[in-house]
Amino acid sequence: MFNQKNKVTRADYEQWRAGQDETAGRIASDPDRLLFHVEPELGWLNDPNGLVQIGDTYHIYHQYDPFDAAHGGPVLWNHLTTKDFVTYENRGPVLFPDSDLDSSGAYSGSAFVHDGKIHYFYTGNVKHFDRDDYDYVLTGREQNQIHVVAENPDELGEKRIAVGPVDYPDDIGTHVRDPKILEHDGIYYMVLGARTKDDRGCVLVYTSSNLEDWSYATRIELGEKFGFMWECPDLFELDGELILVCCPQGVSADGWRYRNPHQCVWFPIEADWEAPSFKIAGQGMPPMVDAGFDFYAPQSFEDAAGRRLMIGWSGCPDATAKSPTVARGWQCALT
């Protein structure tokens, strides 16, 4: 049985997948399957990752646990392509938790194309279950921000740590994840969702001149606590404005707002690129990206036509295990 206590290699997956054709066929013919949305071939799907356009083809990766529709197994990156966002080709998993850097899961991340190569950044999760001090929040756990370079989007290269636990500020716990890259005037910015040791969500910002060597620069936060963790940050420029989208966890409902277990909101950002510093502009409660109950962990990218495209997970942490499709071997979609 695959679980988050053991590494999973491509060979492990392929041996297991060889016996799943009947199950995959049954899932494909399920009457509850959607017509125009990405859904898992088997098991569980969540966050979109590594969204990028190469030529006339869009590449979409996503978090994938094919082993357990209720998501109790290890997380891989699955790969799909499309030219029209109507028909998709499932290329299969390409990133596996097969090393000491990501043995408990290849968590969310992004892709950035530079000089003909694709730079993937993702969080390698390592849970030290055998340690007496393992508590998931403060100790016994590593979240490594891993860099992989590839020329072929189906064949990822060697894994190396770009930013690791030794690079996090002293007041940050073990929850640091979901790297996303922005370039501005020749400098690269990596944003990471984070949780402080006193349970305040924020976004850490690192800078680099070459996509290889990263230094901590600053953080983005509110003056008052707004959730205990900010996941899946996405910092981008849109129509001359700088926008931060992120997913705060632990925010209390406010009337009709924030009724999900965890939220997805956006902030206008005032940037001093020279310092650098990034401050949340305006006051009041941040607006939700989507007011529905099934939109979380979105990621955006700019395509060749200059459009800012966003894909989200049609689901939400701590809210999806009761889906009726779990008993049929699959769950969730991208939207």
Predicted regions and their residues:
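Structural secondary-structure packing elements that flank or coincide with functional cores
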Residues: 303-304
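Anionic-ligand-binding alpha/beta catalytic cores of soluble enzymes and soluble regulatory domains
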Residues: 300
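Beta-rich carbohydrate-recognition and catalytic domains
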Residues: 1-178, 183-228, 239-291, 312-335
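Short, well-structured beta-strand segments enriched in hydrophobic/aromatic residues
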Residues: 308-309
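Repeated scaffold domains used in trafficking and secretory/extracellular systems
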Residues: 231-233, 296
